[in-house]
């Protein structure tokens, strides 16, 4: 049997990976974002009160965009993703959480 699993839901069994289970079972969602190009910072504010921090330069489409374009984002997937229509860029809560966990586990400083 050929599985169609790709870094997320295993569509052959409709099962979620650990991060997706956490996001959906706990109801974790992106509430808003705060962008600071001068500090190379993207803050992801969660409905839980938590804040995730990413380097804007980690995302070339965002890093090279104007502040005007950066402000024109939409939360998608009921707060599980962010879309910038003008930039054709999509980022996910799952990706942010995965990167945060990886960086904390391996002691990387952002």
State the predicted function of each range.
Residues 1-110:
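Motif-centric detector for short Cys/His coordination patterns
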């Amino acid at each position: 049997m050929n599985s169609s699993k790709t870094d997320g839901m295993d569509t052959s069994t409709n099962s979620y990976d650990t991060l997706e289970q956490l996001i959906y079972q706990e109801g974790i969602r992106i509430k808003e974002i705060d962008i600071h190009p001068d500090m190379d910072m993207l803050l992801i504010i969660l409905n839980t009160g938590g804040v995730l921090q990413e380097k804007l330069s980690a995302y070339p489409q965002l890093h090279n965009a104007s502040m005007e374009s950066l402000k024109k984002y939409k939360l998608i997937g009921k707060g599980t993703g962010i879309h910038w229509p003008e930039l054709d860029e999509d980022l996910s809560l799952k990706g942010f959480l995965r990167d945060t966990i990886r960086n904390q586990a391996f002691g990387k400083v952002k």
